[in-house]
Amino acid sequence: MTDSDEDALKVDQGPSRDIPKPWVIPAPKGILQHIFGTSHVFQSICDVKPKVTGLTVPLKVREYYSRGQQCLEQADWETAVLLFSRALHLDPQLVDFYALRAEAYLQLCDFSSAAQNLRRAYSLQQDNCKHLERLTFVLYLQGQCLFEQCAFLDALNVFSHAAELQPEKPCFRYRCMACLLALKQHQACLTLITNELKQDTTNADVYIFRARLYNFLQKPHLCYRDLHSALLLNPKHPQARMLLQKMVAQAQQARQDAGILAVQGKLQHALQRINRAIENNPLDPSLFLFRGTMYRRLQEFDGAVEDFLKVLDMVTEDQEDMVRQAQRQLLLTYNDFAVHCYRQGAYQEGVLLLNKALRDEQQEKGLYINRGDCFFQLGNLAFAEADYQQALALSPQDEGANTRMGLLQEKMGFCEQRRKQFQKAENHFSTAIRHNPQKAQYYLYRAKSRQLLQNIFGARQDVATVLLLNPKQPKLSLLMTNLFPGMSVEEVLSTQIAHLARLQLEQMVEGSLQAGSPQGIVGMLKRHELERQKALALQHSWKQGEPLIATSEELKATPEIPQVKPGSSEGEAEAPEEEEEKEKEKKEEKKSELIPSKVASLSDSYLDQTSSASSMSFRTTGTSETEMSAICQEYRSTSATAVTFSDSSLLKTQSSDSGNNREALSHGPRKIKATQGQRQSLSKTEPTQSQRRNSSKTKATIHKRNSSKTKATQSQRRNSSKTRATQGQGQSSSKTEATQGQRQSSSEIEATQGPRQEPSKTKTTRSPRQRPRKVKAARGRSWRPSKVDATQGRSRGLLRSSTKTEAFYDSNWSLSKTEYAQGQGQRSSKAEGAQGKSQGMSSTSSKAESTWGPSPSLSKTEVDQDLTYYEAV
């Protein structure tokens, strides 16, 4: 625009401008009338004449309006602004010209001038909403331009002003949020978003916006909540899906970090990481399962139970593996919680927790064991026993359950002892031994109970077992003094009672090891290794001079009874030649068969009897009551000490004759020294008797008999002492016995038998395995007729086929004592009949002998051996 145009505009604007008039002192009223008087010529001077402008201004305004519209159409924005400005100078109340000039300023990107003109227009016409909408639009454009120019604070002010003008439009608030985020004023932005969501809860974008803000602020649980709300409003929202995948990836990463920390033992850090994973993905049940496990390991049981229950609520039907894992962890949590209560002394709470666990799982042995421990501490021994039994039913070889059952049975046995119920106490101690056979104190307690029950043999065997397990066991010396008077530990361990105790103990331990051995190749290798070790131990025992045990094949091949080796104190020494033959046979049998079947059967029968009975017997047929009474009567005549124990054991068990013989051995009489002198006086007579009996017919008869007892006497002939030699040659034919019977009167026999009822020092240490049946005949002087001897010969044949193992043990247990009985007790049938008449047998004794004679359990040699044993005692 040129200067001439401006001057013309100024000239045109002159008439419409209000020119201020100078202030003058107003003339007083009536001054003109006072001056001019009554003349009316100058009276019209005071009247103000109106200006005539109505025609000029509207014409100019119309001109500027038309010219400004043309400029807008021609995009001449500056000229339009000038024309509209001139028109507004002519008439400032023209609202439309403000709006038109604002459009021209808007096209010139002068948002401030445009907004100012629109405000002026809106202020003049507030009822016109178009001006307000246009104003807010201009402000939006202005704020957006400032935002793009990174003038975030100015943009925030502009958007805030627009939001104030039109609060119903959220777009201005959204732009304010963007400006606050750009200014890193997150809390202010979060507050603004929260206020926005209070007004409008149907916009998924707002939830996603706040979810992103929460994720940025490391508040994943709030982020996931807003994301979940956004997906509910719009399940296919792409931004929501992208954010969800991002959160799942963050959760998996946190889960891996937690696993690494848990393996390293940093449980607290692992718990923090798994918490972060759950916050990122709270719908994954595996994360709660992991966190519950961490809680359980940190002994935060309430949180663990809550997480596991939440897992069970979250899993679906197709997630069976997850359900099993959650249930398993829940059971372990209950169990660990119960253990924690147990350590704190809250046993009742522990029982309640384990009850919850056992309602869902009945196949877990640990739960029963722990509940049994709680019951044990509460004093409910019956419930504790039931739980331990259930645990053993699930796992019979569980070491912890067997140990606990042993302790429980021990305590129950003590309770029964206090109530004077010694039989029940013995049963409890036997149960404890069955569950823990290597615990020495259980055998000691059972020995005391058996001693009170007058089961002396069982008590001795338990004491021998204690010596094998723990010779330094407290309170053992008193029982040894009572049960093994005058014997040292080595002497007790060298007896056959100790040998049987060792066999039983080895069998029980071996049974437990075999039952607990693993299956498959590993178990087979372990069994082979155990067998090899047994073979080496057996070979070592032969080298050390322990008693040799014949196998079933040797017993069948030779009816003779093997002797005990020189290392043992129970039997006589063998000749060197036979000893070498025995060792060769043993080595050959060891290669083919590591464990003899006969010995195993013996130990089996022994185990069965000792578990419930008080005396052991390897015989199938026991003695009758008449035989027992006769034995006891003859034994009373020998020693008062032996009477007490023998009678008590017989009254208690009425068992086999071998058990009674053992009881009699340990409680020997005190008259040994007194009778040794008398025995020495008779030693000269014995060689002559034995030499006369040593004829060819004797050997023939011995081989015809083929009894195991006869070989025992043959082996004994090789002994060095004259007494043993004569005793070993004691078996002769019937003619030799008749000759001896004619040469010796009945009085001489009685005199010889009387002083020989007490053994020498060598015989006192020998085995107690004696047979009491024929003792009655020898001591009662009721010698049997020839028919009875024939019947006994037949019975020996039956005995060899059925009880070969019994004969084996009989020979090992009573050899030296048999020699004396064989040396003096062989008589012919005629001599026996004459002696029976001369001695005046009673009808009772003859009936007892006739009943006892055809018994298939004993041969004549066995009876003589038993007689020698009781004489020794």
Swiss-Prot record:
The keyword rRNA-binding does not apply. Residues 694-708, 763-784 have a biased composition (Basic residues). Gene3D superfamilies: Tetratricopeptide repeat domain. Residues 583-593 have a biased composition (Basic and acidic residues). InterPro entries: TPR-like_helical_dom_sf, TPR_rpt. Residues 1-20, 553-626, 639-873 are annotated as: Disordered. Residues 600-626, 639-663, 675-693, 709-750, 800-828, 836-860 have a biased composition (Polar residues). It comes from the Eukaryota. Residues 571-582 have a biased composition (Acidic residues). The keyword Ribosomal protein does not apply. Keywords: Repeat, TPR repeat. TPR repeats lie at residues 61-94, 96-128, 136-169, 251-284, 285-318, 331-364, 365-398, 406-439. Pfam families: TPR_1 (PF00515), TPR_16 (PF13432). This is Tetratricopeptide repeat protein 16. It comes from Homo sapiens. The gene is TTC16.
